[in-house]
Amino acid sequence: SDSMWYREKGFGKHDWLYCMLLNFGGNVGLHGRMNQLVNGYYDACAHVNGKRMRGVGATPEGIENNPVMFELLYELPWRAERFSPDVWLQGYLKARYGGELSPEVMEAWRALEHTVYNAPKNSPGEGTLESLLCARPGFHLDRTSTWGYSKLFYSPDSTSKAADLMLSVAEQYKGNNNFEYDLVDIVRQSNADKGNALLDEISQSYDRKDKENFRKQTQQFLELILSQDSLLSTRKEFSVSSWLTAARSLGNTDAEKKLYEWNASALITVWGDSIASNQGGLHDYSHREWSGLLKDLYYLRWKT
């Protein structure tokens, strides 16, 4: 939606920051609006309401995702003149991976830049498009959480292409931690997009009472969940074990450790008690496409 600073009187006499709200619930997914972020900042600088702007800020509910968007946000105050994200991206990737970029890497990121990182301004839902691998089972689903959305605004071929291109040069970048993180994240997104498309096919087979295709497709869907879990187990950033271990480490007694682990588990599953979860619609609000959760929760839900 339109930025708040664009109101008739802006923020009045108050100083303010140009902020990016990228993520809700810590949900996992490639997402952003690169052009809108850059152009919105310089439009604000040139506007009368921009006289009291004092810098930039990030206001996500979950920050450990989409590093490219945070790097782009924090680049803004250092550049006096409007710049093209298209040009900036190449420099960012050189700095992130080091040395010269292979053409395959650049092509992969161009595919992402013009799809997942070019989300429509008024797209439904909050934050990233949701992976239906993490949803409560059902047919014709269009979201995983109450206020989310899962219908792609781009072709899944684009993320599949990006994943294939990154995989094609994986050996060349072996041992490069930033590349390997991005590789896993991009392949994860491609798998999630395939899962969303596959669930649509499953729903259609169910409607047609096509038992043969239904059985085949549901088995593929379950196998995809396990494959996704296996992929994400290669990175601690996508592991529920890392999340729970970090929570327990904050406790000073056994009771505190158990309490913090319980709260960390509840946050990413039911959120709170049954009333908040079901009647309040908060179940899966903070779902995470993570290793451990996929195999031990989402897979079992769908299989049942």
Question: What are these language model-derived features?
Answer:
Residues 1-102, 106-113, 118, 122, ...:
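Catalytic-core regions of glycoside hydrolase
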Residues 149-174, 179, 184-207:
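C-terminal substrate/ligand-recognition segments
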Residues 301-304:
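Short, intrinsically disordered, charge-balanced linker/junction segments flanking boundaries
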Residues 170-183, 231-246:
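Short, solvent-exposed, charged loop/turn and helix-capping segments
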